[in-house]
């Protein structure tokens, strides 16, 4: 328990620098663009580091098919792939900014589930 209080004290003493670093991380995350794909690139989805879908590409050949379920599945798979990549890229930015600090451990100190 005393170690946790000491760690918290150190964290609080560096709040100004931490705020600046977090603002920088926010900017980098906002600039992240990742592409998820499915069907060997027949469907691609672009997402931001903030988890917003900003572009969807569907190859024209898929519109000629009568298999709507296949198209739906490809769009869903590409979207999930893009969001997974965005989450991984965001986690990487946080890890890089914190010098490898595990945010899930900090979260546990406060009884939360942020990481």
From Swiss-Prot:
Under InterPro entries, the record lists: YbaB-like_sf (IPR036894), YbaB/EbfC (IPR004401)
Know the name of this protein? Nucleoid-associated protein LBJ_3002
The record's subcellular locations are:
Cytoplasm, Nucleoid
Q: Which residues form a coiled coil?
A: none
What PANTHER family does the record tag this protein with? NUCLEOID-ASSOCIATED PROTEIN YBAB
Sorted UniProt keywords: Cytoplasm, DNA-binding
One cellular component term (GO) for this entry is: cytosol
In Gene Ontology terms, what is one molecular function of this protein? Answer: DNA binding
Question: For this UniProt entry, what is the primary localization, expressed as one broad class?
Answer: cytoplasm
Its biological purpose: Binds to DNA and alters its conformation. May be involved in regulation of gene expression, nucleoid organization and DNA protection.
What superkingdom heads the lineage? Bacteria
**Quaternary structure and partners:** Homodimer.
Organism from which the protein derives: Leptospira borgpetersenii serovar Hardjo-bovis (strain JB197)
Family stated for the protein in its record: Belongs to the YbaB/EbfC family.
């Amino acid at each position: 328990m005393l170690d946790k209080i000491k760690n918290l004290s150190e964290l609080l003493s560096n709040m100004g620098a931490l705020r600046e670093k977090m603002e920088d991380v926010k900017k980098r995350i906002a600039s992240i663009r990742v592409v998820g794909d499915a069907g060997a690139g027949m469907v691609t989805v672009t997402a931001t580091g903030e988890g917003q879908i900003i572009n969807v590409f569907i190859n024209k050949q898929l519109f000629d098919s009568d298999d709507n379920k296949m198209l739906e599945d490809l769009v869903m798979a590409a979207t999930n792939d893009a969001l997974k990549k965005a989450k991984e890229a965001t986690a990487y930015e946080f890890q890089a900014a914190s010098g490898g600090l595990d945010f899930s451990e900090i979260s546990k100190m406060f009884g939360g589930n942020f990481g």
